[in-house]
């Protein structure tokens, strides 16, 4: 499937998990396709980097579940920071251990571990 075909199957208000860690190994072709789409009000679950910043800048994110959002050399991704400080998005910030165990529980179909 192409990135456009995948994004065409998504709908407003969905929860999307974005793989990778910080600014590394991100599915940026999919992120760019989401940016070109009319999708909105997304809940994004991610160890964030530029992907989260770009989606926040475009107003695509309603809620972000994260452990951190960083560009490494820039400790706090600027577009995410602006969205958070302005109150444009709801956030659930977890420490890295809780975030990782939450993802593991979800993979097993459990509410918690």
What kind of region is each of these model predictions?
Residues 1-113:
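Conserved alpha/beta enzyme-core scaffold
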